[in-house]
């Protein structure tokens, strides 16, 4: 799935149904009526610093990994555990996969996958706690590179892949409900409304 394209499509559908989409805006506060019901948001244009109130009949917190920031604005406790998933990208010539494969990492028996993606081969993913500020883009750590290289070299031992074979990396943050499990991979991937 091209997640950027999916998000754009959801935005288009929302606009077609009468919604308004704004970009480069951060929610900095919630608007409330006298009884305390949330009736809108205060947003800041992150490019200009200008702020604006936007009123709404219904405010939905669909902010993913940032959801606890908004929950804090209504005095609700944090519920999320932020996990980073990182990936390595190899040239298709170096890792010539035409089909998707999934296997268990020899070290910890976590699932790892590899598949053809955008003319290259993608290998992932890690599953570690993300303890960095959400205001910065996530990045893959040296340990994650080693972890994924170890996995792919174990399964495709004839390739002898090194860091020099990695043409790109990327990482993303996924939020899961924090149940206090020691192993991030054991947290449930459930959604709640």
Model-identified regions with their sequence ranges:
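Short, hydrophobic/aromatic-rich segments at coil-to-beta transitions
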Residues: 37-41, 98-99
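A conserved short coil-to-beta-strand element within the FAD-binding core of flavoproteins
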Residues: 23-39
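General beta-strand structural signal in soluble alpha/beta enzymes
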Residues: 21-23, 61, 123
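A generic structural motif
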Residues: 42-46
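C-terminal catalytic lobe of FAD-dependent flavoproteins
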Residues: 3-9, 13, 69-73, 77-123, ...
